[in-house]
């Protein structure tokens, strides 16, 4: 999710493959970053660890973002729809956190 905060030029190489689902194509990574920016959250299935899906959102208090919150869920206990439904409230929570941090003078 933090890579989606960067420009296309700043995302010069994909992350090392951790599983068979890790995005290793730079073009696919750029497409995923664009989709993340459009949705306001990132979603992945078994890209980082087998059996785990994750939804994440940037805490929008720095440019580019340096902080994020994620929710990891077991693949065999979570549907695609449930994972999608997690993204919106997660993005709302990170936005709320950013506002609270600013009011407290932390960011």
Where are these regions (language model features)?
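Short alpha-helical scaffold segments that flank and stabilize functional sites
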Residues: 57-59, 96-97
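Short, solvent-exposed recognition segments
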Residues: 1-48
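Short, electropositive, low-hydrophobicity segments enriched in small/polar residues
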Residues: 44, 55, 74
